[in-house]
From Swiss-Prot:
Its cofactor is FMN. One of its GO terms (molecular function) is dihydroorotate dehydrogenase (quinone) activity. Its EC number is 1.3.5.2. InterPro entries: Aldolase_TIM, DHO_dehydrogenase, Dihydroorotate_DH_1_2, Dihydroorotate_DH_2, Dihydroorotate_DH_cat, Dihydroorotate_DH_CS. It catalyses: (S)-dihydroorotate + a quinone = orotate + a quinol. GO terms for cellular component: cytoplasm; plasma membrane. FMN binds at A62, G63, L64, D65, K66, T86, N139, N172, K217, T245, G268, G297, Y318, S319. This is Dihydroorotate dehydrogenase (quinone). GO terms for biological process: 'de novo' pyrimidine nucleobase biosynthetic process; 'de novo' UMP biosynthetic process. Transmembrane segments: none annotated. The active site is at S175 (nucleophile). Pathway: Pyrimidine metabolism; UMP biosynthesis via de novo pathway; orotate from (S)-dihydroorotate (quinone route): step 1/1. It is found in: Cell membrane.
Length: 336
Protein backbone atom coordinates (compact mmCIF):
# COMPACT_ATOMS: atom_id res chain seq x y z
CA UNK A 1 0.00 0.00 0.00
CA UNK A 2 0.99 3.66 0.29
CA UNK A 3 2.56 3.45 3.78
CA UNK A 4 6.08 2.42 2.67
CA UNK A 5 6.32 5.74 0.81
CA UNK A 6 4.96 7.67 3.81
CA UNK A 7 7.36 5.84 6.11
CA UNK A 8 10.34 6.66 3.91
CA UNK A 9 9.51 10.36 4.17
CA UNK A 10 8.79 10.24 7.91
CA UNK A 11 11.99 8.34 8.63
CA UNK A 12 13.97 11.22 7.13
CA UNK A 13 12.80 13.24 10.14
CA UNK A 14 13.89 13.02 13.76
CA UNK A 15 11.60 10.36 15.35
CA UNK A 16 9.81 12.76 17.68
CA UNK A 17 9.40 15.34 14.92
CA UNK A 18 7.92 12.61 12.70
CA UNK A 19 5.49 11.75 15.49
CA UNK A 20 4.49 15.39 15.92
CA UNK A 21 3.99 15.85 12.17
CA UNK A 22 1.84 12.71 11.94
CA UNK A 23 -0.31 13.84 14.85
CA UNK A 24 -0.74 17.28 13.30
CA UNK A 25 -2.30 15.58 10.29
CA UNK A 26 -4.42 13.23 12.41
CA UNK A 27 -5.70 16.12 14.52
CA UNK A 28 -6.91 17.78 11.33
CA UNK A 29 -9.07 14.81 10.39
CA UNK A 30 -10.18 13.46 13.77
CA UNK A 31 -13.87 14.04 14.37
CA UNK A 32 -14.41 15.36 10.81
CA UNK A 33 -15.62 13.81 7.54
CA UNK A 34 -11.94 13.65 6.53
CA UNK A 35 -11.64 10.63 8.82
CA UNK A 36 -12.71 8.69 5.74
CA UNK A 37 -9.14 9.17 4.47
CA UNK A 38 -7.78 6.89 7.20
CA UNK A 39 -10.78 4.60 7.67
CA UNK A 40 -10.33 0.86 7.12
CA UNK A 41 -12.99 -1.83 7.13
CA UNK A 42 -12.05 -4.72 9.37
CA UNK A 43 -14.15 -7.76 10.29
CA UNK A 44 -16.03 -7.86 13.59
CA UNK A 45 -14.41 -10.40 15.90
CA UNK A 46 -15.88 -9.75 19.35
CA UNK A 47 -13.90 -10.81 22.42
CA UNK A 48 -15.01 -10.72 26.06
CA UNK A 49 -12.34 -9.54 28.49
CA UNK A 50 -12.50 -7.94 31.96
CA UNK A 51 -16.29 -7.93 31.73
CA UNK A 52 -16.19 -5.83 28.55
CA UNK A 53 -16.91 -6.76 24.94
CA UNK A 54 -14.14 -5.69 22.57
CA UNK A 55 -15.20 -5.55 18.90
CA UNK A 56 -11.91 -7.22 17.96
CA UNK A 57 -8.86 -8.39 19.94
CA UNK A 58 -6.40 -5.78 18.63
CA UNK A 59 -5.71 -2.60 20.54
CA UNK A 60 -3.37 0.37 20.29
CA UNK A 61 -0.90 0.37 23.18
CA UNK A 62 -0.40 3.38 25.42
CA UNK A 63 2.23 5.95 24.55
CA UNK A 64 1.26 6.89 21.01
CA UNK A 65 -1.67 9.19 21.86
CA UNK A 66 -0.64 10.41 25.29
CA UNK A 67 -3.24 13.17 25.55
CA UNK A 68 -6.17 11.56 23.72
CA UNK A 69 -5.96 14.02 20.84
CA UNK A 70 -6.62 11.63 17.94
CA UNK A 71 -8.92 8.96 19.36
CA UNK A 72 -11.45 9.04 16.52
CA UNK A 73 -8.90 9.06 13.69
CA UNK A 74 -6.99 6.16 15.23
CA UNK A 75 -10.24 4.33 15.89
CA UNK A 76 -11.23 4.69 12.24
CA UNK A 77 -8.21 2.56 11.31
CA UNK A 78 -9.86 -0.50 12.84
CA UNK A 79 -8.59 -0.87 16.40
CA UNK A 80 -10.95 -2.70 18.75
CA UNK A 81 -9.54 -0.70 21.64
CA UNK A 82 -7.32 2.32 22.11
CA UNK A 83 -5.27 2.96 25.23
CA UNK A 84 -4.41 6.62 25.67
CA UNK A 85 -1.82 8.04 28.09
CA UNK A 86 0.26 7.62 30.11
CA UNK A 87 -1.27 10.68 31.76
CA UNK A 88 -0.30 12.23 35.10
CA UNK A 89 -2.24 14.52 37.47
CA UNK A 90 -0.28 17.61 36.43
CA UNK A 91 1.22 18.51 33.05
CA UNK A 92 4.91 17.74 32.70
CA UNK A 93 7.42 18.18 29.86
CA UNK A 94 9.12 14.80 30.17
CA UNK A 95 12.83 14.24 29.76
CA UNK A 96 15.19 16.37 27.68
CA UNK A 97 15.31 15.84 23.91
CA UNK A 98 16.44 13.86 22.02
CA UNK A 99 14.54 11.09 23.81
CA UNK A 100 13.22 8.82 21.04
CA UNK A 101 15.48 6.73 18.79
CA UNK A 102 14.96 4.28 15.94
CA UNK A 103 16.85 1.02 15.56
CA UNK A 104 15.84 0.62 11.94
CA UNK A 105 17.60 -2.67 11.20
CA UNK A 106 16.00 -4.30 14.25
CA UNK A 107 12.62 -2.57 13.73
CA UNK A 108 12.86 -1.34 17.29
CA UNK A 109 12.55 1.92 19.19
CA UNK A 110 14.26 3.22 22.31
CA UNK A 111 12.44 5.90 24.25
CA UNK A 112 13.10 7.85 27.41
CA UNK A 113 10.13 10.18 27.01
CA UNK A 114 9.41 10.42 30.74
CA UNK A 115 5.60 10.67 30.71
CA UNK A 116 5.45 13.93 28.77
CA UNK A 117 1.77 14.93 28.76
CA UNK A 118 -0.57 17.88 29.21
CA UNK A 119 -2.17 16.55 32.39
CA UNK A 120 -5.28 14.59 33.22
CA UNK A 121 -7.74 17.51 32.99
CA UNK A 122 -6.72 18.18 29.38
CA UNK A 123 -7.04 14.48 28.52
CA UNK A 124 -10.55 14.30 29.98
CA UNK A 125 -11.66 17.24 27.82
CA UNK A 126 -10.34 15.45 24.73
CA UNK A 127 -12.09 12.21 25.70
CA UNK A 128 -15.40 14.06 26.10
CA UNK A 129 -15.19 15.14 22.44
CA UNK A 130 -14.41 11.66 21.07
CA UNK A 131 -16.95 9.33 19.44
CA UNK A 132 -14.88 6.13 19.23
CA UNK A 133 -17.19 3.11 19.37
CA UNK A 134 -14.55 0.70 20.69
CA UNK A 135 -13.18 0.30 24.20
CA UNK A 136 -11.14 3.25 25.47
CA UNK A 137 -8.45 2.46 28.00
CA UNK A 138 -6.78 5.27 29.95
CA UNK A 139 -3.25 4.63 31.19
CA UNK A 140 -2.22 6.55 34.31
CA UNK A 141 1.08 7.24 36.06
CA UNK A 142 2.71 9.47 38.64
CA UNK A 143 4.37 12.84 38.14
CA UNK A 144 8.16 12.77 38.11
CA UNK A 145 8.40 15.18 41.06
CA UNK A 146 6.01 13.15 43.22
CA UNK A 147 8.09 11.07 45.66
CA UNK A 148 7.69 7.33 45.07
CA UNK A 149 6.39 6.87 48.61
CA UNK A 150 3.52 9.24 47.73
CA UNK A 151 3.05 7.82 44.24
CA UNK A 152 -0.26 6.13 44.98
CA UNK A 153 -1.83 9.56 45.56
CA UNK A 154 -1.19 10.46 41.89
CA UNK A 155 -2.87 7.27 40.69
CA UNK A 156 -5.90 7.95 42.90
CA UNK A 157 -6.18 11.54 41.64
CA UNK A 158 -6.14 10.32 38.03
CA UNK A 159 -8.64 7.53 38.76
CA UNK A 160 -11.10 9.98 40.24
CA UNK A 161 -10.93 12.28 37.21
CA UNK A 162 -11.08 9.64 34.46
CA UNK A 163 -13.35 7.00 35.96
CA UNK A 164 -16.55 8.24 34.33
CA UNK A 165 -14.95 8.27 30.87
CA UNK A 166 -12.78 5.13 30.79
CA UNK A 167 -13.67 1.70 29.44
CA UNK A 168 -10.82 0.38 31.57
CA UNK A 169 -7.98 1.95 33.54
CA UNK A 170 -4.36 0.86 33.10
CA UNK A 171 -1.95 1.35 36.00
CA UNK A 172 1.55 2.03 34.68
CA UNK A 173 4.13 1.01 37.28
CA UNK A 174 6.63 -0.34 34.78
CA UNK A 175 8.04 2.52 32.71
CA UNK A 176 11.84 2.60 33.07
CA UNK A 177 11.91 6.36 32.42
CA UNK A 178 10.45 7.72 35.67
CA UNK A 179 12.99 7.33 38.51
CA UNK A 180 11.88 4.75 41.08
CA UNK A 181 8.61 3.90 39.35
CA UNK A 182 9.39 0.21 38.83
CA UNK A 183 9.89 -0.25 42.59
CA UNK A 184 6.09 -0.05 42.86
CA UNK A 185 5.96 -3.51 41.22
CA UNK A 186 7.41 -5.23 44.25
CA UNK A 187 6.42 -6.46 47.71
CA UNK A 188 4.75 -4.14 50.21
CA UNK A 189 4.84 -1.17 47.82
CA UNK A 190 2.75 -3.09 45.28
CA UNK A 191 0.33 -4.42 47.89
CA UNK A 192 -0.12 -0.94 49.34
CA UNK A 193 -0.78 0.55 45.89
CA UNK A 194 -3.22 -2.18 44.82
CA UNK A 195 -5.14 -1.93 48.11
CA UNK A 196 -5.58 1.81 47.62
CA UNK A 197 -6.57 1.39 43.97
CA UNK A 198 -9.18 -1.28 44.70
CA UNK A 199 -10.66 0.80 47.53
CA UNK A 200 -10.88 3.80 45.20
CA UNK A 201 -12.42 1.63 42.46
CA UNK A 202 -15.12 0.46 44.90
CA UNK A 203 -15.86 4.05 45.99
CA UNK A 204 -16.07 5.29 42.40
CA UNK A 205 -18.29 2.37 41.39
CA UNK A 206 -20.78 3.48 44.04
CA UNK A 207 -20.64 7.11 42.93
CA UNK A 208 -20.88 6.49 39.17
CA UNK A 209 -23.04 3.33 39.22
CA UNK A 210 -20.67 1.51 36.88
CA UNK A 211 -17.72 -0.82 37.27
CA UNK A 212 -14.57 0.19 35.39
CA UNK A 213 -12.00 -2.64 35.33
CA UNK A 214 -8.38 -2.10 36.36
CA UNK A 215 -5.40 -3.59 34.50
CA UNK A 216 -1.81 -3.34 35.76
CA UNK A 217 1.01 -2.93 33.21
CA UNK A 218 4.19 -4.80 34.12
CA UNK A 219 7.80 -4.82 32.93
CA UNK A 220 9.44 -7.61 30.91
CA UNK A 221 12.56 -7.50 33.08
CA UNK A 222 11.08 -9.23 36.14
CA UNK A 223 13.01 -12.12 37.65
CA UNK A 224 11.22 -15.44 38.11
CA UNK A 225 10.60 -14.73 41.81
CA UNK A 226 9.36 -11.22 41.06
CA UNK A 227 6.97 -12.50 38.40
CA UNK A 228 5.51 -15.06 40.81
CA UNK A 229 5.07 -12.37 43.49
CA UNK A 230 3.41 -9.97 41.04
CA UNK A 231 1.00 -12.67 39.83
CA UNK A 232 0.12 -13.54 43.43
CA UNK A 233 -0.52 -9.88 44.31
CA UNK A 234 -2.74 -9.31 41.27
CA UNK A 235 -4.89 -12.31 42.17
CA UNK A 236 -5.10 -11.49 45.89
CA UNK A 237 -6.23 -7.94 45.18
CA UNK A 238 -8.80 -8.99 42.56
CA UNK A 239 -7.21 -6.91 39.81
CA UNK A 240 -9.20 -7.29 36.59
CA UNK A 241 -6.36 -7.76 34.10
CA UNK A 242 -2.63 -7.50 33.47
CA UNK A 243 -0.88 -5.87 30.50
CA UNK A 244 2.36 -7.64 29.61
CA UNK A 245 4.69 -6.00 28.84
CA UNK A 246 6.19 -2.55 28.90
CA UNK A 247 9.59 -1.79 27.31
CA UNK A 248 12.83 -3.55 28.26
CA UNK A 249 16.23 -2.38 29.47
CA UNK A 250 17.85 -5.47 27.90
CA UNK A 251 20.06 -4.71 24.88
CA UNK A 252 21.34 -8.24 24.19
CA UNK A 253 19.57 -8.53 20.81
CA UNK A 254 20.64 -5.13 19.46
CA UNK A 255 24.34 -4.98 20.33
CA UNK A 256 26.39 -3.00 17.81
CA UNK A 257 23.39 -1.33 16.17
CA UNK A 258 23.10 2.42 15.80
CA UNK A 259 21.46 3.97 18.89
CA UNK A 260 21.60 0.68 20.84
CA UNK A 261 23.38 2.30 23.79
CA UNK A 262 20.85 5.10 24.28
CA UNK A 263 19.27 5.14 27.72
CA UNK A 264 15.59 4.19 27.84
CA UNK A 265 13.14 1.40 27.18
CA UNK A 266 13.50 -0.78 24.08
CA UNK A 267 10.35 -1.79 22.19
CA UNK A 268 9.55 -3.40 18.86
CA UNK A 269 10.80 -6.66 17.40
CA UNK A 270 13.75 -7.07 19.84
CA UNK A 271 11.18 -7.25 22.67
CA UNK A 272 9.02 -9.87 20.97
CA UNK A 273 10.39 -13.09 22.47
CA UNK A 274 11.00 -11.68 25.94
CA UNK A 275 7.45 -10.32 26.28
CA UNK A 276 5.93 -13.54 24.93
CA UNK A 277 7.86 -15.58 27.50
CA UNK A 278 6.63 -13.32 30.31
CA UNK A 279 3.06 -13.85 29.05
CA UNK A 280 3.59 -17.62 29.00
CA UNK A 281 4.91 -17.67 32.57
CA UNK A 282 2.21 -15.29 33.78
CA UNK A 283 -0.45 -17.48 32.22
CA UNK A 284 0.94 -20.50 34.06
CA UNK A 285 0.93 -18.63 37.38
CA UNK A 286 -2.45 -16.94 36.96
CA UNK A 287 -4.27 -20.10 35.85
CA UNK A 288 -6.95 -18.05 34.05
CA UNK A 289 -7.85 -16.15 37.22
CA UNK A 290 -7.43 -12.88 35.31
CA UNK A 291 -6.87 -12.11 31.62
CA UNK A 292 -3.63 -11.02 30.00
CA UNK A 293 -3.34 -8.27 27.40
CA UNK A 294 -0.24 -9.09 25.35
CA UNK A 295 2.01 -6.37 23.97
CA UNK A 296 5.63 -6.22 22.90
CA UNK A 297 7.07 -6.55 19.41
CA UNK A 298 3.89 -7.56 17.59
CA UNK A 299 4.58 -6.75 13.94
CA UNK A 300 2.73 -9.52 12.10
CA UNK A 301 -0.20 -11.91 12.30
CA UNK A 302 2.20 -14.66 13.39
CA UNK A 303 3.57 -12.54 16.25
CA UNK A 304 0.02 -11.73 17.40
CA UNK A 305 -0.92 -15.41 17.30
CA UNK A 306 2.16 -16.29 19.34
CA UNK A 307 1.07 -13.88 22.08
CA UNK A 308 -2.39 -15.43 22.16
CA UNK A 309 -1.01 -18.97 22.12
CA UNK A 310 1.13 -17.98 25.13
CA UNK A 311 -1.99 -16.93 27.03
CA UNK A 312 -3.07 -13.44 25.94
CA UNK A 313 -6.78 -12.75 25.47
CA UNK A 314 -6.16 -9.41 23.72
CA UNK A 315 -3.10 -7.95 22.00
CA UNK A 316 -1.80 -4.42 21.43
CA UNK A 317 0.61 -2.84 18.96
CA UNK A 318 2.74 0.30 18.96
CA UNK A 319 6.22 -0.01 17.42
CA UNK A 320 4.93 -2.47 14.80
CA UNK A 321 2.34 0.15 13.85
CA UNK A 322 5.14 2.71 13.36
CA UNK A 323 7.16 0.37 11.15
CA UNK A 324 4.32 -1.33 9.25
CA UNK A 325 1.54 1.25 9.20
CA UNK A 326 -2.27 0.93 9.32
CA UNK A 327 -2.24 -2.10 7.03
CA UNK A 328 -0.93 -4.11 10.00
CA UNK A 329 -4.20 -3.49 11.84
CA UNK A 330 -6.26 -4.91 9.01
CA UNK A 331 -3.96 -7.92 8.57
CA UNK A 332 -4.01 -8.86 12.24
CA UNK A 333 -7.74 -8.39 12.79
CA UNK A 334 -8.59 -10.27 9.59
CA UNK A 335 -6.31 -13.26 10.14
CA UNK A 336 -5.81 -13.65 13.87
Amino acid sequence: MYYPFVRKALFQLDPERAHEFTFQQLRRVTGTPLEALVRQKVPAKPVSCMGLTFKNPLGLAAGLDKDGECIDALGAMGFGSIEIGTVTPRPQPGNDKPRLFRLVDAEGLINRMGFNNLGVDNLVENVKKAHFDGILGINIGKNKDTPVENGKDDYLICMEKIYAYAGYIAINISSPNTPGLRTLQYGEALDDLLTAIKNKQNDLQTIHHKYVPIAVKIAPDLSEDELIQVADSLVRHNIDGVIATNTTLDRSLVQGMKNCDETGGLSGRPLQLKSTEIIRRLSQELKEQLPIIGVGGIDSVIAAREKMAAGATLVQIYSGFIFKGPQLIKEIVTHI
